[in-house]
């Protein structure tokens, strides 16, 4: 079943030609001015791609772009894309579309009132929705909601034990890697009768722009709401990583959200090959490794992934080089 592009109820949109992430690769010619409706991962990926191919691009987002990402990194990325020449109108709600192919106007309501954006093509990229219409769930008495089929933690339907849901229709996210993981959960639970849970509190997500931005676990705000003052953050910049300096790709940083006991609650990375670096944090969180554990492995030099160990080491610097540590060293040095 999978998912299909979500089409918003903007006045005039249904009767006008537009592209989605499924059809845009059928575009016969490079658009002169592409209007992108939606500032999420798909919208920003396509916006940057078409801008670099030579199109003028305007992104219209009703809220904050990449609102599910770390807000610090998301804001930095938006700033970089604007510096590149991409127009990004955040907090602008699309209210009407006029005209047609090669001559269209999108009207959006912004903080300072309505604005008109004129373009040649429109890409609708406000998200995707589970494709449930053809499944006839009512006939099978399968409960569902706007996110997909309602399941137990092992992906089995809560209302029909003969039905299992994996991938985009399982209501836990829409990622290729998540669907693959769901398949392994299904095999364990349905075929091997092993206890399995498709928890998604450690779901890694990467937006493949340049530089990449990736997120896993809780953001700082989410962590503080859940754990209060026991939350700390550690940030380490790429401009202090020798491989990044050598490659002249120093933009961005790694941000870790942790508890004072060293438990890793979340991580965000902005930088070249950020998705590769997020792999380490995904493995660490899945196996409940702590910040101390991240200081114990040997990282090859020079690599960009060294930033993980450097960030973990930075967390312990106040304890290692603080007043108490210096006092202890002084005492030990006086011992004959």
Question: What residue spans do the PLM features occupy?
Answer:
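Short loop/edge segments at beta-strand edges and connector loops
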Residues: 1, 20-22, 90-92, 98, ...
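Glycine-rich dinucleotide-binding loop and its adjacent helix/turn
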Residues: 2-56, 60, 84-87, 138-159
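Short glycine-/small-residue-rich Rossmann-like dinucleotide-binding loops
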Residues: 2-3, 110, 123, 127-128
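A short alpha-helix-loop-beta-strand transition element characteristic
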Residues: 4-6, 143-145, 193-204, 229-234
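FAD-binding beta-loop-beta segment adjacent to the flavin cofactor pocket
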Residues: 4-5, 13, 147-161, 220, ...
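FAD-site-proximal beta/loop scaffold in flavoenzymes
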Residues: 14-31, 116-194, 295
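Rossmann-like dinucleotide-binding cores of NAD(P)H-dependent redox enzymes
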Residues: 25-26, 31-35, 41-113, 173-180, ...
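Flexible, glycine-rich terminal cap/loop adjacent to redox cofactors
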Residues: 191, 196, 208-219, 224-336
């Amino acid at each position: 079943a999978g998912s299909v592009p979500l089409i918003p109820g903007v006045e005039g949109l249904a009767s006008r030609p537009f592209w989605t992430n499924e059809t845009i690769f059928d575009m016969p010619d490079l658009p002169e001015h592409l209007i992108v409706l939606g500032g999420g991962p798909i919208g920003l990926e396509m916006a940057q791609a078409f801008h670099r191919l030579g199109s003028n691009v305007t992104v219209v987002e009703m809220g904050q772009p990449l609102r599910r990402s770390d807000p610090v990194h998301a804001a930095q990325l938006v700033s970089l894309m604007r510096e590149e020449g991409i127009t990004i109108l955040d907090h602008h709600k699309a209210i009407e579309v006029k005209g047609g192919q090669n001559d269209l106007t999108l009207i959006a309501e912004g903080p300072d009132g309505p604005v008109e954006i004129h373009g040649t093509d429109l890409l609708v990229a406000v998200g995707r929705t589970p494709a449930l219409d053809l499944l006839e769930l009512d006939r099978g008495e399968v409960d569902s909601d706007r996110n997909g089929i309602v399941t137990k933690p092992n992906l089995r339907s809560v209302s029909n034990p003969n039905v299992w849901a994996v991938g985009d229709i399982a209501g836990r996210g829409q990622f290729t890697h998540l669907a693959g993981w769901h398949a392994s959960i299904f095999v364990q639970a349905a075929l091997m009768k092993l206890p399995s849970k498709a928890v998604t509190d450690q779901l890694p997500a990467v937006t493949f722009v340049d530089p990449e931005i990736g997120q896993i676990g809780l953001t700082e705000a989410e962590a503080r709401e859940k754990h209060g003052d026991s939350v700390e953050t550690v940030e380490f910049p790429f401009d202090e990583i020798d491989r990044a300096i050598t490659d002249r790709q120093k933009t961005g940083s790694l941000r870790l959200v942790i508890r004072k006991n060293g438990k890793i609650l979340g991580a965000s990375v902005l930088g070249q090959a950020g998705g590769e670096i997020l792999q380490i944090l995904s493995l660490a969180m899945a196996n409940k490794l702590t910040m101390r554990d991240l200081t114990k492995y040997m990282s090859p030099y020079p690599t960009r992934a060294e930033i993980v160990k450097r960030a973990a080491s930075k967390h312990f610097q106040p304890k290692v080089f603080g007043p108490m540590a210096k006092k202890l060293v002084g005492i030990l040095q006086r011992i004959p």
